[in-house]
UniProtKB/Swiss-Prot annotation:
GO BP of this protein: glycine betaine biosynthetic process from choline; negative regulation of DNA-templated transcription
UniProt xrefs under InterPro entries: BetI_C, DNA-bd_HTH_TetR-type_CS, Homeodomain-like_sf, HTH-type_TetR-like_transc_reg, HTH_TetR, Tet_transcr_reg_TetR-rel_C_sf, Tscrpt_rep_BetI
Positions of the DNA-binding region: 31-50
Name of the gene encoding the protein in the UniProt record: betI
Pathway: Amine and polyamine biosynthesis; betaine biosynthesis via choline pathway [regulation]
Pfam families assigned to the protein according to its UniProt record, in alphabetical order: TetR_C_6, TetR_N
SUPFAM superfamilies listed in its UniProt record: Homeodomain-like (SSF46689), Tetracyclin repressor-like, C-terminal domain (SSF48498)
Positions of the HTH tetR-type domain: 8-68
Swiss-Prot/TrEMBL keywords: DNA-binding, Repressor, Transcription, Transcription regulation
Protein name: HTH-type transcriptional regulator BetI
Amino acid sequence: MPKVGMPEIRKPQLVKATMSVIDRVGLHAASISLISKEAGVSTGIINHYFGGKHGLLEETMREILRQLSATIKENLSQLPADAHHQRINAIIDGNFVGFQAENQVAKTWLAFWSYSMHDAQLKRLQRVNERRLLSHLKKELKALLDQDQAELVAHGIASLIDGIWLRGTLNPQGIDAEKARVIINDYLDKQLTFYSKLK
């Protein structure tokens, strides 16, 4: 967490610079020196407020997660509470549109995933994000399926989101949001049809 007193105007500047440098040289080569030059600040500012590269990466991921959460909440707020299928699509869309679909953000996500396997704090952030996604999905799916089925389908959708994200970051053309929507909706429709036949 950044120390209290960090000028709010500087945080977005540093987050953007961090993503830009990760995009250009990768996480391991993204030094405080390169990030500070990109942001136009001294290395001392980053070290003082964030405690170094790790703290800045953590704040960058927190910002990406905040924006993801805000996008999904905004999408859901525009839909009726009983429009469950549409609300599931709104959750899915939140992961593939706007800020989240930018190439720099996608590459930062990928770096974050790989780093979080060996870092307790980043792993905790990753788990918070995973639980939040599953919670949103299960809430809507439980209105359409029983609890066990909703759990399985929620995990299936989350796995597809992660897989499409991973493939998108490795693709020079980036993430194809429309194709992602089609693939995930095809899975969802097939699951809903399958379970409806069991009733």
